[in-house]
Design a protein with these regions (language model features):
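Pepsin/retropepsin-fold aspartyl endopeptidases
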Residues: 1-139
Length: 139
């Protein structure tokens, strides 16, 4: 067992919409590719403040969050398109406490994309209950 790191591509969903409507060029879509630590104890995709600023994501709300060092009011941002391997979702992201905390891939992202952690190979893989295919739950 060890640390599982995965590449994540994050795009500003508002920019994607603007490019689709012809308001901006596709190469003007703000995006960042990062390596993030898979952390099944975290809820959201958690990003350093400088990455959120670079992406230009919209503030949604602040919420109390339990961390290993106590409870903090952290900010949630909307308008992120998240791609890991060949799967893409749109969801809110959480801002890390500071820029020194690494990006984290939380369990909500894993569940929405139907990924499971393979600790032996230090990677994520498609859910074996669904033969590795991306299958969503309705109930």
């Amino acid at each position: 067992m060890g640390r599982t790191l995965e590449k994540v591509l994050i795009k500003n969903d508002d920019d994607i919409f603007s490019a689709e409507k012809g308001y901006i060029l596709p190469n003007q879509i703000r995006c960042v590719e990062i390596e993030a630590l898979v952390d099944t104890g975290a809820s959201y995709l958690c990003l350093p403040p400088k990455v959120i600023k670079e992406l230009g994501l919209r503030f949604a709300k602040s919420t109390p969050v339990k961390t290993g060092s106590g409870i903090y009011d952290l900010r949630i941002f909307k308008g992120a398109e998240i791609t890991i391997k060949d799967r893409t979702i749109e969801m809110q992201v959480m801002e890390n406490i500071n820029d020194n905390v690494p990006p984290l891939i939380g369990y909500l992202v894993l569940e929405m994309m139907d990924w499971v952690v393979d600790p032996k190979n230090q990677t994520i893989m498609g859910n074996p209950l669904n033969d590795g295919k991306w299958v969503m739950d309705m109930y």
